[in-house]
């Protein structure tokens, strides 16, 4: 039975996700509605992607009984309102990362989803790439021996992107791209809470975080570290080292297709790329869409791959890190 999607917001990421959904079997995925705060933009998006219904408000989409699951592709500060609206209307929700600007927002959304017994998942698409799944298998099999260190880097010059440096839009490196690094170390060490977090970094002149390096001490004398930046290019790789070897996700580690296990190179080709994809390896969004279908058809209320408790943990870590370098957002005071 097809999962009936409603798309909330008509930005670039929503366009990619919609295009990818339409490469999947119609027996499993159908996009039935789209909403924007401007009806003309919603209609334009609907025409481009052949979507039957277009709405000029998110409220109208939330009330549409034909929508089973909402995909939230708004900018960070609008995530909470859109998620809460859709949950209140009884919809399952897949929300782009980060689910919330701060930990309080994430906890409020999680509590709402649980109280209503509705599915909610943070769209950390990285976890569902076959290369990431293969890495988890390597770790589970003990191929690397006793784990010691996990390391990730993600840096691009994004200064030309207005929202990346806009404090009002919760810009900066941590929430936009650093979350990919944090989720990596968390995945490696089983979603454990770090015992200690050490941070060095610099702020951009607009008040957002510019470049940040973080050391996370986990139970068992193992540690993770990462650097993220919106002003410099980094290696954009991730690795795990143990007493018997190392495994690496090659660039781009946030949407990986190549894995090196103890020197052995493995490739995981993407499915066919939809036309007009805006982001690197956008076809890989199909993996998380398939996972949502599986979860909902099994009656699950959250994903076992990125459970809500881990979304809360990631939000806690990101908030602690940015506050350590003096970065706050307007949403923190609400």
Curated annotation (Swiss-Prot):
Tissue and organ expression note: Small intestine.
UniProt key word Oxidoreductase: yes
EC id: 1.3.1.20, 1.1.1.179
Site feature location: May play an important role for the adaptation of the alcohol substrate into the binding site: 176
Keywords of the record: NADP, Oxidoreductase
Gene3D superfamilies: Dihydrodipicolinate Reductase, domain 2, NAD(P)-binding Rossmann-like Domain
Site, as annotated: May play an important role in catalytic activity: 180
Biological-process GO terms, alphabetical: D-xylose catabolic process
Pfam families associated with the record: GFO_IDH_MocA (PF01408), GFO_IDH_MocA_C3 (PF22725)
One MF term in the entry's GO annotations: trans-1,2-dihydrobenzene-1,2-diol dehydrogenase activity
Reaction(s) catalysed by this chain's protein: (1R,2R)-1,2-dihydrobenzene-1,2-diol + NADP(+) = catechol + NADPH + H(+); D-xylose + NADP(+) = D-xylono-1,5-lactone + NADPH + H(+)
Site (May play an important role in coenzyme binding): 71, 79, 97
InterPro entries referenced in this protein's UniProt entry, alphabetically: Gfo/Idh/MocA-like_OxRdtase_N, Gfo/Idh/MocA_domain, GFO_IDH_MocA-like_dom, NAD(P)-bd_dom_sf
Oligomer status and interactors: Homodimer.
Similarity field: Belongs to the Gfo/Idh/MocA family.
Protein name as catalogued: Trans-1,2-dihydrobenzene-1,2-diol dehydrogenase
Lineage: Eukaryota, Metazoa, Chordata, Craniata, Vertebrata
């Amino acid at each position: 039975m097809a999962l009936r999607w409603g798309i909330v917001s008509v930005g670039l990421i929503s366009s990619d996700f919609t295009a990818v959904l339409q490469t999947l079997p119609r027996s499993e995925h159908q996009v039935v509605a789209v909403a924007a705060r401007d009806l003309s933009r919603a209609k334009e998006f609907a025409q481009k992607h052949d979507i039957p219904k277009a709405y000029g408000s998110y409220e109208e989409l939330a009330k549409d009984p034909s929508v089973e699951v909402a995909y939230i592709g708004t900018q960070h500060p609008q995530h909470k309102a859109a998620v809460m609206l859709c949950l209140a209307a009884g919809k399952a929700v897949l929300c782009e990362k980060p689910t919330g600007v701060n930990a309080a927002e994430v906890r409020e959304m999680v509590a709402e989803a649980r109280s209503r017994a509705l599915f909610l998942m943070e769209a950390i698409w990285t976890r569902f790439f076959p290369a990431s799944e293969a890495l988890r298998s390597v770790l589970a099999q003990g191929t690397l021996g006793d784990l010691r260190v996990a390391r990730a880097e993600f840096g691009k010059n994004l200064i030309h992107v207005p929202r990346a440096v806009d404090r009002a839009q919760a810009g900066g490196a941590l929430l936009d791209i650093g979350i990919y690094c944090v989720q990596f170390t968390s995945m490696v060490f089983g979603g454990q809470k770090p015992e200690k977090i050490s941070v060095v970094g610099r702020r951009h002149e607009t008040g957002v975080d510019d470049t940040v390096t973080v050391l996370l001490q986990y139970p068992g004398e193992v540690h993770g570290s990462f650097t993220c930046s919106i002003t410099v290019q980094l290696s954009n790789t991730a690795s795990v080292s143990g007493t018997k070897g190392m495994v690496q996700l090659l660039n781009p580690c946030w949407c990986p297709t190549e894995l090196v296990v103890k020197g052995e190179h493995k490739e995981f080709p993407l499915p066919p790329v939809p036309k007009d994809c805006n982001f690197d390896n956008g076809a890989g969004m199909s993996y998380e869409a398939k996972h949502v279908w599986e979860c909902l058809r099994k009656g699950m209320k959250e994903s076992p791959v990125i459970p809500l408790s881990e979304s809360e943990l990631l939000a806690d870590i990101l908030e602690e890190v940015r506050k350590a370098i003096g970065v706050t957002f307007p949403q923190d005071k609400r």
